A protein has these predicted regions:
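Intrinsically disordered, low-complexity non-transmembrane regions of multi-pass membrane transporters
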Residues: 1, 98-100
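Short amphipathic
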Residues: 3-14
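Short strand-loop junctions, especially beta-strand C-caps/beta-turns
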Residues: 13-15, 42, 70
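Preference for bulky hydrophobic residues occupying beta-strand positions
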Residues: 10-12, 39, 67
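Intrinsically disordered, low-complexity regions enriched in small/polar residues
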Residues: 35, 39, 54, 86-87, ...
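Acidic-glycine-rich active-site phosphate/pyrophosphate-binding loop
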Residues: 1-3, 31-32
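Amphipathic alpha-helical interaction surfaces in cytosolic regulatory modules
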Residues: 16-38, 44-63, 75-80
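C-terminal structural segments of small proteins and small subunits
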Residues: 61-98
Length: 100
C-alpha cells in the first residue's frame, strides 16, 4: 500500500496566534492518526506531535503555515486540521474573550 502525502496552506485565524491551548489540541488530534504530520512557518518546521516544536513556530495571527501529512491516515488528519484552522478554533477564542 502506498503512503498518502497531503500538503495544504492555512492561515492562523486565532486572535492570539497559535498559542498553547490550540497547540495542545493539535497535538491531541495527531495522536489519533497513523501518519507523520509537520507544520512549517517559513524556514521553521515542527513535528505536530510536539508542543514545544509548535510553540517555536511563533505563528502570529494571519501567519500562513504549510501543513504536511504523510502516511495511511494523512488525508483524514489533514481534513481535521484544516477545519481546525479554518474555524479559527472559536472554542478557545470565546474562553479568552470572557477574561477581557
Amino acid at each position: 500500500m502506498q503512503e498518502s502525502v497531503c500538503r495544504q496552506i492555512v492561515t492562523v485565524k486565532m486572535k492570539q496566534g497559535l498559542h498553547l491551548r490550540p497547540i495542545s489540541e493539535i497535538v491531541r488530534m495527531t495522536r489519533d492518526y497513523a501518519c507523520d504530520f509537520k507544520i512549517s512557518n517559513g524556514d521553521r518546521s515542527a513535528n505536530a506531535r510536539e508542543v514545544y516544536d509548535l510553540l517555536e513556530l511563533q505563528a502570529l495571527p494571519e501567519t500562513e503555515l504549510v501543513l504536511e501529512a504523510v502516511g495511511d491516515d494523512a488525508t483524514k488528519l489533514m481534513e481535521e486540521i484544516v477545519q481546525f484552522f479554518e474555524s479559527g478554533y472559536k472554542k478557545f477564542e470565546e474562553v479568552s474573550d470572557l477574561s477581557d
